[in-house]
């Protein structure tokens, strides 16, 4: 963890999704769990980071405004210390792109 990180715990998951009890339906959480498990990655749910971003004019008011926040463990795509891309950068980018497509499909199928 970086010094500025709120959570200094080791053993972070590969990916983390931040959720909101009002704006993140269980459906999105289950899709996320299944996707990352199938890909062989670990997934934290609100661990080590929690919450998601919702426009204030909809926050806790508009139930059909959904929100999920994706955090990616730097160890997957960076050589540390520093900010050089690792050999896994492209693979990580492709995984994220595929995940976003899965989420988009989930919205379209409703």
Ranges and model annotations:
Residues 1-78:
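Catalytic cores of processing enzymes, dominated by hydrolases/peptidases
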Residues 80-110:
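His/Asp/Glu-rich mid-to-C-terminal helical/loop segments that flank catalytic regions of hydrolases
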